[in-house]
Design a protein with these regions (language model features):
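Secondary-structure junction/capping motif
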Residues: 12, 190-195
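Acidic, small/polar-enriched beta strand-loop surface segments
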Residues: 18, 22-24, 28-128, 135-176, ...
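Short acidic/polar beta-strand-loop edge motifs in secreted extracellular
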Residues: 1-19
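Short, solvent-exposed secondary-structure boundary/capping segments
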Residues: 176-189
Length: 196
């Protein structure tokens, strides 16, 4: 994906890179992860960070599971473009009526600089945000040093009223080495990947 030229004034390099990653995510629904790989900056598509490592009732210790529509969940996307030639505002909307009926209107609004691919961008944003936010915190998981933030792991757990069996993304990991044992505490995130 090629981002239109832009000026980033008084921004750190990290902020500029994050803006580029955010713009790419909005336009393509593809998430990329930038990380330090033993002194070498590496940029990877999240899909390329899958590991064939299973976390289940036997490899995980304790867990905490939450689901919410309070943050980062939108069932209506509205993009607005101020057309300076006509003096009118152009609106691009994507929405999911079934979720609006279930949750009410949860609207994402953004002003855009160009109408190029505006409808595609609205659809991509709806696809990205039109789901409950699900977080899973796992404690004392058998450790694997290859696991880092951004890694996708297979998680198969019974969570009471539902069964989870899917890849989830590691948002944060803490490795603990003690008495020749290695454990991890993981903050996981997934959207529609949780099966009911």
């Amino acid at each position: 994906y090629t981002i239109a030229s832009r000026v980033e004034d008084n921004k750190t390099l990290a902020d500029i890179i994050q803006t580029a990653l955010d713009e790419t995510l909005k336009a393509t629904s593809q998430m990329y992860v930038l990380y330090d790989d033993v002194g070498k900056l590496t940029l990877k598509n999240i899909g390329d960070m899958k590991m064939e490592l299973l976390i289940d009732d036997e490899t995980a210790g304790d867990f905490d599971y939450k689901t919410s529509i309070a943050a980062q969940t939108y069932d209506k996307v509205k993009l607005s473009y101020e057309n300076k030639d006509t003096g009118k505002r152009e609106i691009f909307i994507a929405q999911d009526s079934s979720n609006i009926n279930q949750w009410g209107v949860l609207q994402y609004y953004e002003k855009i600089d160009s109408t190029a691919n505006a409808k595609v961008m609205a659809d991509a944003l709806l696809n990205l945000y039109n789901t409950k936010t699900r977080t899973l915190k796992l404690k004392n998981v058998l450790g694997d040093i290859r696991v880092r933030a951004g890694t996708m792991l297979v998680v198969t757990l019974g969570l009471g009223d539902m069964n989870l069996s899917s890849y989830l993304m590691v948002e944060q990991v803490k490795h603990t080495f003690s008495n020749e044992q290695h454990f991890m505490d993981l903050n996981m995130r997934g959207g529609t990947s949780v099966s009911y």
